Amino acid sequence: MSSRTNVVGIDFGNSKTVIAVARNRAIDVIVNEVSNRSTPSLVSYGERSRFLGEAAKSAEASNFRNTVGSLKRLAGRTYDDPEIKDIESNFISAKLTEVDGFVGAKVQYLNEETAFSNIQLIAAYFTKIKAIAEAELIGSVSDVVISIPAWFTDIQRRALLEAANIAGLNPLRLMNDNAAAALTYGITKTDLPEPESPRRVAIVDFGHSNYSVSIVEFSRGQFHIKSTVCDRNLGSRNMDKALIDYFAAEFKEKYKIDVLSNPKATFRLATAVERLKKVLSANANAPLNVEMIMNDIDASSFIKRSDFEELIKPLLERLTPPIEKALELAGIKKEDLYSIEMVGGCTRVPIVKEVIANYFGKGLSFTLNQDEAVARGCALSCAILSPVFRVREFHVHDVTTYPITFSWEPIPENPEEDSSLEVFSEGNPIPSTKILTFYRKAPFKLLAAYSKEAQLPGSIKQNIAQYLINDVVPNKDGDLSIVKIKVRLDLHGILVVEQAYIVEEQEVEEPVETSPEEEAEKKTDEPVKMRKVKKLVKVADLSVSVQEDRLPTEVLEKYREAEHQMIATDKLVAETVDRKNALEEYIYDTRAKLDDIYAPFTNEEESSKFKEMLTKAEDWLYEEGEDTTKAVYTAKLEDLMRVGGPIRQRYLDAEEAKRQKVQAEREAAKAATKSEAEKQKPSGKFEEGTGGRAPPPPPAEEVAPENEEVETMEIDEQKE
């Protein structure tokens, strides 16, 4: 398959990631190397290589200090961000540190202490996601759409883009996860109303670390996000934390151990709690057992679902305020909603469903796949954006979460001039372009910033970027030039100054508009009437210098080179392990066959020498050959195969001779059967009076009943 036909959607989750692909007129979810439909969002660093995804999950228990999760929560953040220090550090077992001005993780990699930035960590994980997709599609993957939380800021979105680019991916769009779920819902509906009376739907997404509510209006061929409200730090991991603290307090009293003071014990308890919570979703109570939690103690306990629900009551109280706010921003009442669509793994918790259903006063809808709806929406979006896919037309109208204001210094010629303007308001469509007009005679600066600092996550800076508009000069009369600046919120939700230029008012000629009657009366050879009008005409492009709080190009290039080197190292280690396993398998397999199927094809002396050779290779493999290079394992295997190859070939030749003999016997039997069947057929000879056809079989002879007279008739047959 050509790489250009591979369109992939990635739901980059906090605990796991789902990959979907558009193919064969459908959206399929891709399974990973262990046939799971989702891949743990983990990267782990070892003595010889990295472990990514499922491999990182397997290594986590013994290597948790060098394993990093909650990857997307680190994107674009600084080390001193209070949400990093006070919240994320509780969910990440690796040591967090500052790397190139942003938060990263310090781990032991290749037996050395190494620090990786959040961009490097995410890029490492994306290389695994890319490899999973390519293995399934049997071709390269580049164009993707990646989901992000709607509350991600400009710098967080840029960090994710940079990580994806380092991993060799080309994101066509960073898509807000609520919009992706809405696309999955809407594009399959054939009964959507006209735009005049849209269908209003609430999409409630309750995932591992984030809770969001969107009010969406669906109509034929499109949807509009009317509002999105998030609780950035509410998710299933908060429920896990409540259970961990509960059982840790119980074990402190019951076993006199302080689980929370021991990272390994805390990890073991967290693993057990995750299993327990799943049991509680389907049962009224659940046991908890943790073997060797610490100090050689096997800890056990028990909890009722009702006690669990009481334990997380403070979390449940946070479910309705975002719903109320979303309805308020959308300007509708809950009674106006057609349905409430539930997305995210945490929506399986019975008490969560109960609280939300009670607020709306109606049943909840689970028509969307809670785990896969966002990934499917991303794949659909990628197909829509791809020039090689034909998808039913469906327009996505997403909105920005944070308003953006531009500010500038007033000029001496106009000191009363406004010095700021909110260019993109809250709920402004994405993508969106605005043109700002200034009157200047010299270069000037523009500052883009979020309008409301209190809305931003953690210590994300309010300022987005500063733009220096260069090359501005007075107009030909020595007066102020008219400067136009085109600013855009692109498909990723990232702010871009696309163009700056000077315009002048010039007198130009344009055709005079005529009525249809005048057009009909006009003679063919009559010249077109023109009139002179004054219009703004672009006369010069201006260069724009940008100052952003982002990593320099040379640092990103260093990350790219480091990632390529680590990919090569991972590949070499994997191939070395493969050769070692192949050698081990050959030793055991061949030795068993020498006493079995290979026995008739070797003599005692040859067999004895070869067995001795295999035993020596086995001893070497578990001693000095325990840790060596790919080339050495390959050479050892080739040495053994040179001796064992002739024996194996004699066996294969004999098997082939048997096969041919059986085949010949079958063909002979088949031929004999066919010959016998031919003999049983009618002769097929033509006879006179039959019109060139074989004569029909003779009629059955009738036997007259007793005492019945039989009349014999003779027919003279007329020949042709």
From Swiss-Prot:
Region (Disordered): 658-720
Subcellular location: Cytoplasm
PANTHER family according to UniProt: HSC70CB, ISOFORM G, HSC70CB, ISOFORM G-RELATED
Comp. bias (Acidic residues): 703-720
Source organism per UniProt: Schizosaccharomyces pombe (strain 972 / ATCC 24843)
Keywords, alphabetical: ATP-binding, Cytoplasm, Nucleotide-binding, Phosphoprotein, Stress response
Assigned protein family: Belongs to the heat shock protein 70 family.
Positions of post-translational Phosphoserine modification: 38
Protein name (database record): Heat shock protein homolog pss1
GO cellular component: cytosol; nucleus
